[in-house]
Amino acid sequence: VNIIFILIVFTIGSDLFIEAYPRKLFYIGCYLSIFGLLFLENWKGFRQWLLSNKIAIAFLLSIVLLGASKLIWSMIFPSTHLQDIKDNYYAGGKLLILSGVMAFYLLKSVSVISFQSWKFAACTSVVLGLLTVWFGYQEQAIGINRIKLLADAATTTAYIMVVQSVLCFSLIKKAVSNQLYRTVFYIATFFIFSYLLLMTETRGAIGTFFIVCFVLACFELRNVKPRYWFLALLAISVIGGGIAYKMQKRIVEAYDNIQQLQKNNANTSLGARFVMLDAGQHVASFSLFGQDAEQRYNKARQYIEKNYKSAEAVRAIKYHFHNDIIESFSLQGLFGVIAIILFYVTGFLASCEKKNKFNVGLLLYMSALFLMGLTDVLFIQRNTAMVIGACAVILLLCQRDENKKIENARQ
């Protein structure tokens, strides 16, 4: 169990700079989990365990259901001209299903995870973040303004980084009991991922990251003196101002896009996103498993050319609609949209299932995915799906009743 736990943490943290091996390690963790479920697990009291963890189990089932919606669609509608969409959804769906299976085993065996493993995982996560900074710096040094590392685009890289930052914060919160050391690790993590996200210049991810940090500060500082609140807000404001200055070109571009949209010119980046949201609703498939990607594209293209004449939107809709719910509804039909809504609902419920005690990491994770999913599609890229699924596994373990010996080890 401890080996699987460490493998998953390493998989998440190394995904952007080590090619192929993180996915292989993920599969190894999955196979070990399946082996544990079939041959090694003690099933005594299983029914009682299910009842006491029903919300967490519902969240795991929603992950499996979400993966199944992607996998089934890719098998029913094998596109001839948009093969990469089919391949990504096939691989991503499979990885999400395996994440749910692995999480089930680790959740059942969470009491076996030692305090030393939690500390090692936290340190590993921070070190891998620093290594990502190094590889990102090397990429910028050769003249690439918006780094993408091993992902398919800078935006994908940024979304993975936000998920990695949530995992890093959560592991630090779990493993470091000394308030001073924890604060130092928090600050280091904040600087690491602020710099990484700045190198991607992805506005949505940077905004989401600062919201995540603010919510985390609210939980961590709720019982401290007001002057510490002031210092924390001052630090975030200063760094945020520095990032805003560094990204002023992208901010001016966004402002210009909004001005153009007010003049009914939707042929801009932001304008095209509003057009895609409208088109996605009009071409949504009310069938159970959705429609072919080419069929959706042709319907959406005709609608946009008739109502908006936005060349930017027509170019983008070939692959996705820049919104997770609209994307699922328009492509994977009723099954897809129900699956992703259940994922969000059960995820938020699982983060606050205990009275007066939140799973802060899971809450931040779900909030980040929801916010980023409003302006882009997260599950279309297989590596993103793997990181999201694997991160859910770890975060779900961070606040379980079975972890009493972790608390004892701190005392």
What are these regions (language model features)?
Residues 226-228, 331-367:
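Hydrophobic transmembrane alpha-helices and their immediate junctions
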Residues 267-271, 275, 289-332:
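Long extracytoplasmic/lumenal interhelical loops at the membrane interface
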